[in-house]
């Protein structure tokens, strides 16, 4: 295992721990327990570690939260969809947009990519995760709900975490926090 892999795994583990501890501050909405800190961690992981690490972090945090009684099974579809889409939008879509001559000539970089990560988290968690929560609620939890029941509560929770991420990720980029912690091997610099 390479040294950078160990550093990335350690960073992911710290972010999972932050999500679990942060879930003690949750907003109960129906059968779900919305945790804005999870969405903040999803964006940080998606931006600095990539979509696959972020997806694994969201799964791990959701599993631990459920085992400790701090979350519900609805944590899985919401957090995992938002985490993956945040990283995917930042790294794949954002990189393609930044490689276009229009964006290159204006040196847009993070000005384009970060809003894509935020939008990915919001859309992935609220719309996709909210709709995927329907079968989880109906078949696993025994709660009858309409298909779009969880979209708005998930959006509100995700919006809180995303607004916090706007402030925190911008500050982390300014001081090059993860470049210092992980070295130059962050997904960002590849």
State where each predicted segment sits.
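Loop-helix junctions at membrane interfaces
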Residues: 1-190
């Amino acid at each position: 295992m390479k040294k950078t892999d160990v550093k990335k795994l350690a960073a992911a583990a710290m972010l999972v721990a932050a999500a679990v501890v942060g879930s003690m501050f949750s907003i109960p909405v129906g059968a779900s327990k919305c945790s804005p800190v999870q969405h903040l961690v999803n964006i940080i992981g998606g931006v600095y570690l990539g979509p696959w690490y972020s997806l694994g972090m969201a799964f791990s945090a959701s599993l631990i939260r459920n085992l400790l009684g701090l979350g519900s099974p609805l944590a899985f579809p919401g957090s995992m969809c938002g985490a993956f889409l945040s990283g995917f939008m930042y790294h794949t879509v954002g990189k393609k947009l930044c490689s276009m001559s229009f964006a290159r000539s204006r040196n847009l970089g993070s000005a384009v990519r970060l809003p894509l990560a935020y939008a990915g988290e919001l859309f992935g968690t609220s719309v996709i995760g909210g709709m995927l929560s329907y079968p989880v609620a109906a078949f696993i939890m025994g709660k009858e709900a309409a298909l779009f029941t969880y979209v708005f509560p998930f959006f509100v929770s995700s919006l809180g975490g995303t607004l916090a991420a706007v402030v925190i990720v911008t500050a982390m980029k300014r001081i090059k926090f993860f470049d210092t912690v992980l070295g130059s091997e962050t997904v960002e610099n590849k």
